[in-house]
């Protein structure tokens, strides 16, 4: 059994670690709130762009853009959004399980898969998992910009334009609340079929005059919209990362507190036993005299 000095040293070490985990919990909570604000700020941009695209499509029904037309699926691309750092519980592990499950379903249908990776954790995972990686982006930070992500998006769109991919998916973590994050798979290209009530399925009674031509404008808008969807996915993933880290650090802080209590109990018992032993020896010595 450890002696009193060893237990005191262990308690001091755990208390030091507890201070670190408590500080990390507070930092993660602050970063999570900022990421949530960026999520809220980015949604109106994507929503308004989707409405303009919907109007352009309805105003020019004869023009079928390649990003809105389904074709036989033989090759599929995945844009995987992960974090650069760990200490976020099972956030990335659950995401990769979702990817592997989805990829396996594609491969069972003899569909080839390719990847574009965002985040160091995804790069490390697919280095072991294998697969054809078209591009990778790491070190995006807690406040990523759209410019950091365009490379990974463009390499997938180029492959789609060349006929090397027939469908592109975005895989990222969805923010439910501060305690819950769920991995999700969204179809990016071709744009997923419109659901009832969706902007792409809505009839508008107003008209615009477009400069330049609507077809040229649609070409640029669709690329920009796809980039904004990936950006929104990355921002949401940052919020998920920080919330998962906040929860993980809170659990670590609580566990450290419980461990300190257990060690202090052991310390007190050992100290009590040592004092009792000393008293017994003194009493025994006095009796002998």
UniProtKB/Swiss-Prot annotation:
Cellular compartment(s): Cell inner membrane
GO biological process per UniProt: proton motive force-driven plasma membrane ATP synthesis
GO cellular component, one term: plasma membrane
InterPro entries the record matches: ATP_synth_F1_ATPase_gsu (IPR035968), ATP_synth_F1_gsu (IPR000131), ATP_synth_F1_gsu_CS (IPR023632)
Gene3D superfamilies: 3.40.1380.10, ATP synthase, gamma subunit, helix hairpin domain (1.10.287.80)
GO molecular function terms noted in the UniProt entry: ATP binding; proton-transporting ATP synthase activity, rotational mechanism
Membrane topology: Peripheral membrane protein
Top-level lineage group: Bacteria
Key word Ligase present: no
Job description of the protein: Produces ATP from ADP in the presence of a proton gradient across the membrane. The gamma chain is believed to be important in regulating ATPase activity and the flow of protons through the CF(0) complex.
Assembly, per entry: F-type ATPases have 2 components, CF(1) - the catalytic core - and CF(0) - the membrane proton channel. CF(1) has five subunits: alpha(3), beta(3), gamma(1), delta(1), epsilon(1). CF(0) has three main subunits: a, b and c.
Protein name: ATP synthase gamma chain
Organism whose genome encodes this protein: Acinetobacter baumannii (strain ATCC 17978 / DSM 105126 / CIP 53.77 / LMG 1025 / NCDC KC755 / 5377)
Name of the encoding gene: atpG
